[in-house]
Amino acid sequence: MTNIRKSHPLIKIVNHSFIDLPTPSNISAWWNFGSLLGFCLVIQIVTGLFLAMHYTSDTMTAFSSVTHICRDVNYGWLIRYMHANGASMFFICLFLHIGRGLYYGSYTYFETWNVGVILLFAVMATAFMGYVLPWGQMSFWGATVITNLLSAIPYIGTVLVEWIWGGFSVDKATLTRFFAFHFVLPFIIAALAMIHLLFLHETGSNNPSGLISDSDKIPFHPYYSIKDLLGALILLLIFMNLVLFSPDLLGDPDNYTPANPLNTPPHIKPEWYFLFAYAILRSIPNKLGGVLALVFSILILMLFPILHMSKQRSMMFRPLSQCFFWILVADLFTLTWIGGQPVEYPFITIGQVASVLYFMIILIILPSISLLENKLLKW
C-alpha cells in the first residue's frame, strides 16, 4: 500500500509543497522569511478575527470599542497589541524577503516575482485600512490625507475621492467600508500567497549562488522544516518582547486621542513602514507628480527583471553591485527617517536627494554597474 501522504489527493499537494519538496542544499537563513510571512499572516488573521468580534465600525463607538477591548475583554489588550505590532513584524519580514529577492536575483522568476509585488500592494492596502479603524486622530487624518491623494487624478479625481469616502468627508460610510475591506483582504492575500507558492514550485527555489541546483537538492522536511521552525521561534521571541514590554514603541501617541475633524495634529504621518514612500511623495512639490512617484516607488519592483543586465543571476560574486545594493538600503533608511520629520529645511532637501538617488540607483546605476562587471569578466 502506498504511503497516504503520496496517494491521498489533498495530502499529496501538501506533501509536494512542504515535505518532499526538492530544495537547494545551500539556501541560507535569508530563505526563512517566506515561511515567517505565512506565520505572520496566520497571527494577523487569528487576532483580527477575535478583535472583529468586539469591534464596532461606527464613528460614534469605534474608539470606545477599542478601549473596551483593551480594558474589559479577557486578554483583549494582548490581542489588540499582537495585531498592531504583528503588522510591523509582517512588514519587517516583507522588506527582508524583497531585499533577499533583489540581492540574489530571485526576480528572474517573472510570475512569482510579479505575484509578490501584487501581494505587497495588497498588504499595504490592508495595513492602511486597518490603521484607520481605531478612529484616533492619526487614523482620521491619515485616512483624509492619503485618500485625498486620488484627487490628483485628472478629470475623475474629485468624484473618485467622494465615491471612496461615501460622502463629502471621511465619515461613518468610510469607516464601515474600510472595516469590510480590511476584513476580507487578508483572505485574498492568503489566496495570492498560494498562487505565489504555486509559481515558485513550478521553477524550484533560487539559491545564494544563483546557479542551477538541480544536481544537489535535498527534501524540505526535515532539513528546512526544522530551520523554519527555529526562525519562527526567534521571530516569536522578538515579537512577544515587543508586545509585552513596549507595545506602543512603533505606534503614534496621537492615536490615543479620539478623532476630531476640527483639530489637525501638528505632524500627520503614516505608520513607520510607509514612511519611505511618504517621503518620496512629499519630496515632489507637484501633487500629481508626488502621487505618481509614490506609486512608481513600489511599482518599480516590477521593472527589476527587465533591468537585469548582468550575466550572473546573484550578487554573490559581484562586489560592485553589492556596494550599490547596500547604498540603496541605506537610502531607504534615510527616506524612512525623513518621512517622519517635519516639512522644513534641511529635511526637504535631504528627502529630495534621497528620492532622486533611489530612482537613479535602480534605473541607471545598477544596470550600468552590471554591464561594467560583464566587461571586467570579459563576458
UniProtKB/Swiss-Prot annotation:
<feature type="transmembrane region" description="Helical">
    <location>
        <begin position="33"/>
        <end position="53"/>
    </location>
</feature>
<dbReference type="GO" id="GO:0046872">
    <property type="term" value="F:metal ion binding"/>
</dbReference>
<feature type="binding site" description="axial binding residue">
    <location>
        <position position="182"/>
    </location>
    <ligand>
        <name>heme b b562</name>
    </ligand>
</feature>
<keyword id="KW-0813">Transport</keyword>
<feature type="transmembrane region" description="Helical">
    <location>
        <begin position="347"/>
        <end position="367"/>
    </location>
</feature>
<dbReference type="InterPro" id="IPR016174">
    <property type="entry name" value="Di-haem_cyt_TM"/>
</dbReference>
<keyword id="KW-0408">Iron</keyword>
<dbReference type="GO" id="GO:0045275">
    <property type="term" value="C:respiratory chain complex III"/>
</dbReference>
<feature type="transmembrane region" description="Helical">
    <location>
        <begin position="77"/>
        <end position="98"/>
    </location>
</feature>
<dbReference type="InterPro" id="IPR048260">
    <property type="entry name" value="Cytochrome_b_C_euk/bac"/>
</dbReference>
<feature type="transmembrane region" description="Helical">
    <location>
        <begin position="288"/>
        <end position="308"/>
    </location>
</feature>
<keyword id="KW-0349">Heme</keyword>
<feature type="transmembrane region" description="Helical">
    <location>
        <begin position="320"/>
        <end position="340"/>
    </location>
</feature>
<keyword id="KW-0999">Mitochondrion inner membrane</keyword>
<dbReference type="GO" id="GO:0008121">
    <property type="term" value="F:ubiquinol-cytochrome-c reductase activity"/>
</dbReference>
<keyword id="KW-0479">Metal-binding</keyword>
<dbReference type="InterPro" id="IPR005797">
    <property type="entry name" value="Cyt_b/b6_N"/>
</dbReference>
<dbReference type="GO" id="GO:0006122">
    <property type="term" value="P:mitochondrial electron transport, ubiquinol to cytochrome c"/>
</dbReference>
<protein>
    <recommendedName>
        <fullName>Cytochrome b</fullName>
    </recommendedName>
</protein>
<feature type="transmembrane region" description="Helical">
    <location>
        <begin position="113"/>
        <end position="133"/>
    </location>
</feature>
<keyword id="KW-0249">Electron transport</keyword>
<keyword id="KW-0679">Respiratory chain</keyword>
<feature type="binding site" description="axial binding residue">
    <location>
        <position position="83"/>
    </location>
    <ligand>
        <name>heme b b562</name>
    </ligand>
</feature>
<dbReference type="InterPro" id="IPR030689">
    <property type="entry name" value="Cytochrome_b"/>
</dbReference>
<dbReference type="Pfam" id="PF00033">
    <property type="entry name" value="Cytochrome_B"/>
</dbReference>
<feature type="transmembrane region" description="Helical">
    <location>
        <begin position="226"/>
        <end position="246"/>
    </location>
</feature>
<dbReference type="InterPro" id="IPR036150">
    <property type="entry name" value="Cyt_b/b6_C_sf"/>
</dbReference>
<dbReference type="InterPro" id="IPR048259">
    <property type="entry name" value="Cytochrome_b_N_euk/bac"/>
</dbReference>
<keyword id="KW-0496">Mitochondrion</keyword>
<comment type="similarity">
    <text>Belongs to the cytochrome b family.</text>
</comment>
<dbReference type="InterPro" id="IPR005798">
    <property type="entry name" value="Cyt_b/b6_C"/>
</dbReference>
<keyword id="KW-0472">Membrane</keyword>
<keyword id="KW-0830">Ubiquinone</keyword>
<feature type="binding site" description="axial binding residue">
    <location>
        <position position="97"/>
    </location>
    <ligand>
        <name>heme b b566</name>
    </ligand>
</feature>
<feature type="transmembrane region" description="Helical">
    <location>
        <begin position="178"/>
        <end position="198"/>
    </location>
</feature>
<dbReference type="GO" id="GO:0005743">
    <property type="term" value="C:mitochondrial inner membrane"/>
</dbReference>
<feature type="binding site">
    <location>
        <position position="201"/>
    </location>
    <ligand>
        <name>a ubiquinone</name>
    </ligand>
</feature>
<keyword id="KW-1133">Transmembrane helix</keyword>
<feature type="binding site" description="axial binding residue">
    <location>
        <position position="196"/>
    </location>
    <ligand>
        <name>heme b b566</name>
    </ligand>
</feature>
<comment type="subunit">
    <text>The cytochrome bc1 complex contains 11 subunits: 3 respiratory subunits (MT-CYB, CYC1 and UQCRFS1), 2 core proteins (UQCRC1 and UQCRC2) and 6 low-molecular weight proteins (UQCRH/QCR6, UQCRB/QCR7, UQCRQ/QCR8, UQCR10/QCR9, UQCR11/QCR10 and a cleavage product of UQCRFS1). This cytochrome bc1 complex then forms a dimer.</text>
</comment>
<dbReference type="InterPro" id="IPR027387">
    <property type="entry name" value="Cytb/b6-like_sf"/>
</dbReference>
<comment type="function">
    <text>Component of the ubiquinol-cytochrome c reductase complex (complex III or cytochrome b-c1 complex) that is part of the mitochondrial respiratory chain. The b-c1 complex mediates electron transfer from ubiquinol to cytochrome c. Contributes to the generation of a proton gradient across the mitochondrial membrane that is then used for ATP synthesis.</text>
</comment>
